[in-house]
Amino acid sequence: MLFIFNFLFSPLPTPALICILTFGAAIFLWLITRPQPVLPLLDLNNQSVGIEGGARKGVSQKNNDLTSCCFSDAKTMYEVFQRGLAVSDNGPCLGYRKPNQPYRWLSYKQVSDRAEYLGSCLLHKGYKSSPDQFVGIFAQNRPEWIISELACYTYSMVAVPLYDTLGPEAIVHIVNKADIAMVICDTPQKALVLIGNVEKGFTPSLKVIILMDPFDDDLKQRGEKSGIEILSLYDAENLGKEHFRKPVPPSPEDLSVICFTSGTTGDPKGAMITHQNIVSNAAAFLKCVEHAYEPTPDDVAISYLPLAHMFERIVQAVVYSCGARVGFFQGDIRLLADDMKTLKPTLFPAVPRLLNRIYDKVQNEAKTPLKKFLLKLAVSSKFKELQKGIIRHDSFWDKLIFAKIQDSLGGRVRVIVTGAAPMSTSVMTFFRAAMGCQVYEAYGQTECTGGCTFTLPGDWTSGHVGVPLACNYVKLEDVADMNYFTVNNEGEVCIKGTNVFKGYLKDPEKTQEALDSDGWLHTGDIGRWLPNGTLKIIDRKKNIFKLAQGEYIAPEKIENIYNRSQPVLQIFVHGESLRSSLVGVVVPDTDVLPSFAAKLGVKGSFEELCQNQVVREAILEDLQKIGKESGLKTFEQVKAIFLHPEPFSIENGLLTPTLKAKRGELSKYFRTQIDSLYEHIQD
């Protein structure tokens, strides 16, 4: 007993004391620096609840009131930007760079002032401060795009984005449909397209073109011959400064943008989006992640996804509402990695196509068995931490395996949001493990202003698109033709809320097809409520067709399954009502096909491999195997395929600007090959 007393209360030797203090300091340092888990704030087994009428809402939404805004002083996009100016204390707003140079920044006040000057110029040129006054914006992502858009909002006008890749016919359609008299564009080349349409008598309403980039006198003179005034953006802003008008801010219910959707068939439809639509969607995102991620003026987003798409518009609304910054890529997607390393963004909006490319590159670099083993072990270890809510990028595996990937995206990413297309479980799991940041998946479409469901913080499972956002309800409706019934928690996804658009511009027939009499938006997607209350997109109602024997076919569902085949980069599944079977056009993966063929004992150039019968039959066999494993019925399997060496792309007219297959164009383009495949089957 005396020994214990002496041990406890006798002075310790200096070395022992130092050891104890060092150990204590280490424990204290670990306690204050250890990663704080991002834990769910609700029961992940019960993420949404039913309400009257068969719809569902997120369980965190305590009442049935739908979110319309996050901040009382930011109910329109004009107010959102002014709030950003205030909370950032006129901090940096829009960043741009030239090759091999750092980013240069325009402050919030500079952007606001330039928007007021440009808007004043529009009024001086005869435009009115009215939500039925449409201004075209025909440019790639850059600061002047935002200045042009904000100029519209500052004076209650409506922005009408034109896609870079829409093509001349669609541009004619949009200019005429929206009766656009003025277009703000970036390059002389685009101005020539617009002038050419006027010269041919296609777009008589167009009277003024404002150009961001320098242009020569020849362009101006050519425009004048067609009755078009050509102005530089610099001169337009100076003109507006001389004839300044006070801002005429819009109301939340006023139109903000006409977003023309890239239809897979027919002319683009102009979705009428209000200020409240955009603000409510951005507010719902902030509400969804409020305890896990709170944007600050120190945050930076990279802008490379088209500003003509609502996904990118919502991201930027979130950024400006919190006084954060947006850095624009140089305009060349091949330089995006360099832009990100320079910008070091904290918010990274992404699409599966880009993430898949990064994922494939990492997988291909892990060539040896040891590298593959270490990569798999690293992902598994990090994902186990993630399941406990621990998100970090300073672990042993980060330093050994993932640092290079993180650095390629700038090394500071806090949040990745992916949308626009389904994300595979393997890719989602990889990025959640590798990036050491929060990775969320969103689902929606233009007509609901970009998003209607979102995965929740703390739920790091994959294979679903989350729960309804606080700005909308979601319900399913029976699709009897496809054997989907709500009694089985399956059906067409329908949306109602403050984010649902007002209809299609001057197209009541298409509007009635999309919006029913009760205000529900019918998406054309087939969803399933999972037991935990999350939504899974399982099929597509549109683009279905019937085979000769009466069986309904949803080709996109089949294509999504076949895309899991390693040698397949793209696939188009085709069927006809007078035919009893399906055929397909496959674009092989240039990185995979040579090794795939080598295992079959076949060598040659990529084009030669595409023409090789042994290779073609092996790929067909692989497709049918994957289809069977995935539950495809016999009539849903392709019976013959053609291997095409050139990818489907926007440039060759086979994909829409949102990278969806133009099924009608594909059928026409491959008509000869399709007929040959059917003849082969009959033989």
UniProtKB/Swiss-Prot annotation:
The UniProt entry, under InterPro entries, shows:
AMP-binding_CS, AMP-dep_synth/lig_dom, ANL_N_sf, LC-FACS_euk
Which reactions appear under catalytic activity for this entry? a long-chain fatty acid + ATP + CoA = a long-chain fatty acyl-CoA + AMP + diphosphate; (5Z,8Z,11Z,14Z)-eicosatetraenoate + ATP + CoA = (5Z,8Z,11Z,14Z)-eicosatetraenoyl-CoA + AMP + diphosphate; hexadecanoate + ATP + CoA = hexadecanoyl-CoA + AMP + diphosphate; (E)-hexadec-2-enoate + ATP + CoA = (2E)-hexadecenoyl-CoA + AMP + diphosphate
Q: Give the membrane topology, semicolon-separated if more than one.
A: Single-pass type III membrane protein
What EC number(s) would the UniProt record show?
6.2.1.3, 6.2.1.15
Entry cofactors: Mg(2+)
Principal place of residence:
mitochondrion
Assigned keywords, A-Z: Acetylation, ATP-binding, Cell membrane, Disease variant, Endoplasmic reticulum, Fatty acid metabolism, Ligase, Lipid metabolism, Magnesium, Membrane, Mitochondrion, Mitochondrion outer membrane, Nucleotide-binding, Phosphoprotein, Signal-anchor, Transmembrane, Transmembrane helix
| Single GO MF annotation | oleoyl-CoA ligase activity
What effect on the protein does mutating K388R have, as reported in its record? Answer: In a colorectal cancer sample; somatic mutation
What the entry lists under PROSITE patterns is as follows: AMP_BINDING
In the UniProt entry, the disease listed is:
Diarrhea 13: An autosomal recessive disorder characterized by neonatal onset of recurrent vomiting and diarrhea, leading to severe failure to thrive.
Name recorded for this polypeptide: Long-chain-fatty-acid--CoA ligase 5
**Protein source organism:** Homo sapiens (Human)
The upper taxonomy is:
Eukaryota, Metazoa, Chordata, Craniata, Vertebrata
Gene this chain is encoded by: ACSL5
